[in-house]
UniProtKB/Swiss-Prot annotation:
Binding sites annotated in the UniProt record for Zn(2+): 109, 114, 138, 141
UniProt key word Zinc: yes
Keyword Cytoplasm: no
Family: Belongs to the PyrI family.
Biological processes annotated in GO: 'de novo' pyrimidine nucleobase biosynthetic process; pyrimidine nucleotide biosynthetic process
Organism: Sodalis glossinidius (strain morsitans)
SUPFAM superfamilies from the UniProt entry: Aspartate carbamoyltransferase, Regulatory-chain, C-terminal domain, Aspartate carbamoyltransferase, Regulatory-chain, N-terminal domain
Quaternary organization: Contains catalytic and regulatory chains.
Gene Ontology molecular-function annotations: metal ion binding
GO cellular component, one term: aspartate carbamoyltransferase complex
The protein, known as: Aspartate carbamoyltransferase regulatory chain
NCBIfam families reported in the protein's UniProt record: ATCase_reg
Designated gene of the protein: pyrI
Biological function: Involved in allosteric regulation of aspartate carbamoyltransferase.
Cofactor: Zn(2+)
Length: 154
């Protein structure tokens, strides 16, 4: 008797697969980007084995397709993730992520005096890269923060 040690996550016929998400980040992406606001089937793999990362998370969204803009907003949390478009069980498009110019309606400004924290307005940040550092500038208070300060407050 042979034993198959491969972990199997069911394939989807059509939709989006977000792969190579850092371990422990998949649930945060589902929540922040409201990926569960659907009646379609969602398959989540957490702490899956990965040759590149050691462990990774994976999200499969059946019959849901992300725009390039939506996909690139994921890069702030998962810069090395790939977003695969699936049709008839085949990958028809593979997108590597790049940081967008703006991230709107997802993150919270860490400045406790910012109007976005007390008023019903969608948050917005301009993404700036300074060498290897990513900074986010709030569109309301115009303060600039290291990206980690903003993503940890979300």
């Amino acid at each position: 008797m042979t034993q198959d040690n491969k972990l199997q996550v069911e394939a989807i016929r059509r939709g989006t697969v977000i792969d190579h998400i850092p371990a422990q980040v998949g649930m945060k992406l589902l929540s922040l980007f409201k990926l569960t606001a659907t009646d379609e089937r969602i398959t989540i793999g957490l702490n899956l084995p990965s040759n590149q990362q050691g462990k990774k998370d994976l999200i499969k969204l059946e019959n849901i397709f992300l725009t390039e803009e939506q996909a690139n907003q994921l890069a702030i949390y998962a810069p090395h993730a790939t977003v695969n478009r699936i049709d008839n069980y085949d990958v028809v498009r593979k997108q590597t992520l790049s940081l967008p110019e703006r991230i709107d309606g997802v993150l919270t400004c860490p400045n406790s005096n910012c109007i976005s924290r007390s008023e019903p307005v969608a948050s917005g940040f301009r993404v700036q890269v300074h060498g290897q550092q990513v900074h986010l500038q709030c569109k309301y208070c115009e303060k600039e923060f290291e990206h980690q300060a903003v993503v940890q407050s979300a």
